[in-house]
Amino acid sequence: MSKEDMIEFSGTVMELLPNAMFRVKLDNEHSILAHTSGKMRKNRIRVLAGDRVNVEMTPYDLTKGRITFRFK
């Protein structure tokens, strides 16, 4: 799947879950499970509850996503 096929949303991290997973509430009031992208892990960018994030999701599974950016 190419990067152009991904859907981007903004949301807020609601809770931290085990195995580096996060519960994210999107701006459209949906709640999804998300993990951080590889570049965020490599650069040790911390994500905490209450942070605003960008999430990209595949159109095939709209319940899971990848956190690609944390707003300051």
Curated annotation (Swiss-Prot):
Keywords: Cytoplasm, Initiation factor, Protein biosynthesis, RNA-binding, rRNA-binding. SUPFAM superfamilies: Nucleic acid-binding proteins (SSF50249). InterPro entries: NA-bd_OB-fold, RNA-binding_domain_S1_IF1, TIF_IF1. Transmembrane segments: none annotated. Residues 1-72 form the S1-like domain. It comes from the Bacteria. One of its GO terms (molecular function) is ribosome binding. CDD domains: S1_IF1. It is found in: Cytoplasm. Pfam families: eIF-1a (PF01176). GO terms for cellular component: cytosol. HAMAP family: IF_1. One of the essential components for the initiation of protein synthesis. Stabilizes the binding of IF-2 and IF-3 on the 30S subunit to which N-formylmethionyl-tRNA(fMet) subsequently binds. Helps modulate mRNA selection, yielding the 30S pre-initiation complex (PIC). Upon addition of the 50S ribosomal subunit IF-1, IF-2 and IF-3 are released leaving the mature 70S translation initiation complex. Belongs to the IF-1 family. This is Translation initiation factor IF-1. The gene is infA.
